[in-house]
């Protein structure tokens, strides 16, 4: 049936005298009305895949309502085994017990074993009442029952074996999963530690690069022999600047000492250097109890005690601190040298110098201390120290045109002779660090790996796109002249006329070329 029309539409149709136009496509019958179907069968489904009828859907419900044999409940394998073994089939007394148990727990058993035992008991009673032939039949029935019980036992044994195998497999899978998860977590932690170490090294190197400019500026300061002259001629302005710089340097030195003490105090193996206690050399590893004690101590004492030292006390204090730290430094260097040596697997191969201990090699290099100090006191950069006269350049001999220019040749090691005990210049070590940084950044990518090279190229393009170009937006539409300043002409000279012809002779020559032989004065007189 069609849906009822609203009251407003019915009233409008009644008040409108104009007859309605019937739609030829409209179908008043509901059975033949065009409808949108929910599903369209294109013949792709198989013919056997038919829908379940309503009778089959109601069949299980009706069977459960009519017969209790089809009723059941969800149970586990273990509970089913216990219930199954409780039903002993060979003896009649057990059958009677099973009958009593079946009458009490008939609703809880859903596997049909109770009905089988009842049928067997009835057959046994019938066999006792019957004749000898019947007794023979009963014996055969008893044999069949024994065979049935044996089959059930074999099935249960097979299921037990399957359960044991499943348990073993699950245990093995759990052990393997736990082992693999531990390995993966360890590798992840190692990777994070290495990443943090590389990031820390990059930050330290960045700080060293920023300190290079300050080091060059420090080397240009006036030295002690001419410093009083600068102080006298500088006046109060120089004195105030000197006082402020002294305070800033003192605060910086205290901050660096506090940072060093904080770092040494946080690590258990170096805490004795700050506390002044004896180092614990019994065990290198730290147990969980020690970690808890360390955490409690940190809560009680978050930082080492602050030291108030004067400027005169810092040299002796730093010398003592360095001597105390040397023991831990040597132990750490030797430990990691041995680990890397074992990991490389090149024991007993190579030169004899590499077979020596790392501490022996360091001591051998530090033996010539005077040479190392001279290397740091050698001026390697081009800068002028205030208060010292500028070096006078050597005069260059004049050369005539056509002769080759000769430059003055100095000794090969002239730059090494420029020694100054009041400066510290390690440009060679600084440039070595820069070279290693550039090599590490550039050689980290495999040249054959096109994907990695493409990613690097995209990163470079992204950085280039971030750079803002300086564009003069007011110079468009002719509002501003655009011009390029030409460079000055160098070695330019006007041409010199070396001809012997005078200007009058040159004029007469050109006039004769065009047929005008009269001189210009005669033309003017006419």
UniProtKB/Swiss-Prot annotation:
Residues 13-51, 63-175, 274-307, 388-410 are annotated as: Disordered. The gene is Aatf. Part of the small subunit (SSU) processome, composed of more than 70 proteins and the RNA chaperone small nucleolar RNA (snoRNA) U3. Interacts with POLR2J, RB1/RB, RBL1/P107 and RBL2/P130. Interacts with PAWR and SP1. May also bind MAPT. Residues 96-108, 115-125, 147-174, 282-293 have a biased composition (Acidic residues). This is Protein AATF. One of its GO terms (cellular component) is small-subunit processome. Residues 283-338 are annotated as: Binds RB1. Expressed in adrenal gland, brain (Purkinje cells), heart, kidney, liver, lung, muscle, ovary and testis (at the protein level). Transmembrane segments: none annotated. Belongs to the AATF family. One of its GO terms (biological process) is negative regulation of apoptotic signaling pathway. Its main location: nucleus. Residues 30-40 have a biased composition (Basic and acidic residues). The modification Phosphoserine is found at residues 62, 170, 240, 283, 287-288. The modification N-acetylalanine is found at residue 2. Part of the small subunit (SSU) processome, first precursor of the small eukaryotic ribosomal subunit. During the assembly of the SSU processome in the nucleolus, many ribosome biogenesis factors, an RNA chaperone and ribosomal proteins associate with the nascent pre-rRNA and work in concert to generate RNA folding, modifications, rearrangements and cleavage as well as targeted degradation of pre-ribosomal RNA by the RNA exosome. May function as a general inhibitor of the histone deacetylase HDAC1. Residues 240-282 are annotated as: Binds POLR2J. Residues 339-438 are annotated as: Binds RB1 and SP1. It comes from Mus musculus. It holds the Pfam family AATF-Che1. It is found in: Nucleus, Nucleolus. Keywords: Acetylation, Nucleus, Phosphoprotein. GO terms for molecular function: leucine zipper domain binding.
């Amino acid at each position: 049936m069609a849906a009822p029309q609203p009251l407003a539409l019915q009233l409008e149709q009644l008040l409108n005298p104009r007859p309605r136009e019937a739609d030829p496509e409209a179908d008043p019958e509901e059975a033949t009305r065009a409808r949108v179907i929910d599903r369209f069968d294109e013949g792709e489904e198989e013919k056997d895949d038919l829908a379940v009828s309503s009778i089959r859907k109601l069949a299980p419900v009706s069977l459960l309502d009519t017969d209790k044999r089809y009723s059941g409940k969800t149970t586990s394998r273990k509970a089913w085994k216990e219930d199954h073994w409780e039903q002993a089939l060979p003896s009649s007394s057990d059958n009677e017990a099973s009958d009593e148990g079946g009458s009490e727990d008939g609703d809880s058993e859903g596997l049909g074993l109770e009905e089988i035992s009842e049928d067997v008991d009835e057959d046994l009673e019938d066999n006792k009442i019957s004749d000898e032939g019947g007794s023979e039949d009963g014996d055969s029935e008893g044999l069949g029952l024994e065979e049935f019980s044996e089959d059930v036992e074999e099935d249960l044994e097979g299921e037990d074996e399957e359960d044991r195998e499943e348990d073993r497999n699950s245990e093995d899978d759990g052990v393997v999963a736990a082992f693999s998860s531990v390995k993966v977590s360890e590798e992840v932690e190692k990777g994070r530690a290495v990443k943090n170490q590389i990031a820390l090294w990059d930050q330290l190197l960045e700080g060293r690069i920023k300190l290079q400019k300050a080091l060059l500026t420090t080397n240009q300061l006036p030295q002690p022999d001419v410093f009083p002259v600068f102080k006298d001629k500088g006046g109060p302005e120089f004195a105030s600047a000197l006082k402020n710089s002294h305070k800033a340097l003192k605060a910086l030195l205290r901050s660096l000492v506090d940072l060093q003490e904080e770092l040494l105090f946080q690590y258990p193996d170096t805490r004795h250097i700050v506390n002044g206690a004896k180092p614990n050399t019994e065990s290198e590893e730290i147990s969980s109890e020690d970690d808890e004690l360390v955490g409690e101590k940190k809560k009680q004492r978050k930082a080492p005690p602050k030291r108030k030292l004067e400027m005169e006390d810092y040299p002796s204090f730093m010398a003592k601190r360095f001597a105390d730290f040397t023991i831990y430094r040597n132990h750490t260097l030797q430990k990691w040298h041995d680990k890397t040596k074992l990991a490389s697997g090149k024991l007993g191969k190579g030169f004899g110098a590499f077979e020596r201990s790392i501490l022996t090699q360091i001591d051998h290099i530090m033996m010539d201390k005077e040479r190392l100090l001279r290397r740091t006191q050698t001026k390697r950069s081009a800068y002028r120290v205030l208060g010292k006269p500028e070096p006078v350049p050597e005069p260059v001999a004049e050369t005539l045109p056509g002769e080759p220019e000769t430059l003055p040749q100095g000794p090969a090691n002239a730059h090494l002779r420029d020694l100054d005990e009041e400066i510290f210049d390690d440009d060679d070590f600084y440039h070595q660090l820069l070279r290693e940084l550039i090599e590490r950044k550039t050689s980290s990518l495999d040249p054959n790996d096109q994907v990695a090279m493409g990613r690097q190229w995209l990163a470079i393009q992204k950085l280039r796109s971030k750079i803002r170009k300086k564009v003069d937006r007011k110079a468009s539409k002719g509002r501003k002249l655009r011009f390029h300043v030409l460079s000055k002409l160098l070695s330019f000279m006007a041409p010199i006329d070396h001809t012997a012809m005078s200007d009058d002779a040159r004029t007469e020559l050109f006039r004769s070329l065009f047929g005008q032989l009269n001189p210009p004065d005669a033309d003017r007189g006419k």
